Regions:
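Active-site neighborhood of HAD-like aspartate-dependent phosphohydrolases
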Residues: 1-48, 81
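Asp-based, Mg2+/Mn2+-dependent phosphohydrolase catalytic module
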Residues: 1-4, 85, 111, 115, ...
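Generic structural signal for small/hydrophobic residues in well-ordered secondary structure
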Residues: 10-13, 75, 125, 191
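Tryptophan-centric aromatic hotspots in well-structured domains and transmembrane helices
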Residues: 18, 104-107, 145
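Hydrophobic alpha-helical core bundles mediating ligand binding, dimerization, or RNAP-core interactions
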Residues: 22-30, 46-50, 71-72, 94-101, ...
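Alpha-helical elements of Rossmann-like donor-binding domains used by nucleotide-donor carbohydrate transfer enzymes
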Residues: 24-28, 45, 73-77, 96, ...
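A metal-dependent, Asp-based hydrolase signature
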Residues: 34, 40-43, 48-95
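Short, acidic loop-to-helix structural element flanking the phosphoryl-transfer center
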Residues: 64-69, 84-124, 161
């Protein structure tokens, strides 16, 4: 394999367990406001609005808007679906819950795996999250990124080509010197189309026990790994010696 200098990571679902974290944050809010909903189902309903909220931005119908703002808008819509009018809850409570995405826990292998990978490669998120969200998450979870490049840096949301290409450009690297690491086959397909290398990491619990999508690699990815530690093992075998740029 040709040298890979930077590993660029999808975050929600690949590095952190968004579903459990959002459910944990939502549960006391729902109880406090008398909303009889399962916290994990509530998290799923909130997450289902994630991609549609970005569609208007990708199409150009709406100017680029940070994910924190989209998350808050989506939260208000989901709360309304559950019978809670926005004005009936203190704005501070809504704000705190909308930032649940800043406080997500890493998968058990994430920190140790990233630390190993960092020794040989530049590691950075390539996420639809905004800089403040990713920074707060990293500080809380101990994610050892070399750089934090939120979507507002590229002014594009995956799977737009600009999201991948501008990230590589900002790092001063050709697309082929970067590897996209994700638990989502669609993300990898978009990255591969614009010249990035690809690594699939299975996260079969991302969507809970009923998950049916992305249980296995479905494309010709460069690496398929069980977790980040396995990814480190495979890259160490494939790429000797160290390939960090001078």
């Amino acid at each position: 394999m040709a040298p890979v200098q930077a590993l660029l990571f999808d975050v929600f679902g690949t590095v952190v367990d968004w579903r459990s974290g959002v459910a944990r944050e939502a549960a006391p809010f729902l109880a406090r406001h008398g909303i009889a909903a399962d916290a994990h189902a509530f998290a799923d309903a909130w997450r289902r609005r994630y991609d549609p909220a970005m569609a208007a931005i990708r199409s150009g119908a709406r100017p680029f808007t940070r994910l924190d703002i989209l998350h808050r808008e989506n939260l208000l819509a989901v709360l309304a679906e559950h019978g809670l009018a926005p004005e009936s809850a203190p704005a501070a409570e809504i704000d705190a819950l909308s930032r649940a995405w800043h406080r997500l826990d890493p998968w058990p292998d994430s920190v140790a795996g990233l630390t190993r990978l960092k020794a040989r490669h530049i590691i950075a998120p390539l996420s639809n999250g905004n800089v403040a969200l990713l920074l707060n998450m990293a500080k809380r979870a101990g994610l050892p990124w070399d750089a934090i490049l939120g979507a507002e840096v590229a002014q594009a949301y995956k799977p737009q080509p600009e999201a991948y290409l501008r990230t590589a450009e900002i790092l001063g690297l050709a697309p082929g010197a970067c590897m996209m690491v994700a638990a989502h086959n669609g993300d990898l397909a978009a990255a591969r189309t614009v010249g990035l290398r690809t690594a699939f990491i299975a996260r079969p619990a991302e969507h809970g026990p009923g998950q049916t999508k992305d249980l296995a690699a479905t494309g010709p990815w460069d690496v398929v790994a069980r977790d980040f530690l396995d990814l480190a093992d495979q890259l160490e075998r494939l790429q000797e010696p160290h390939v960090l740029p001078a």
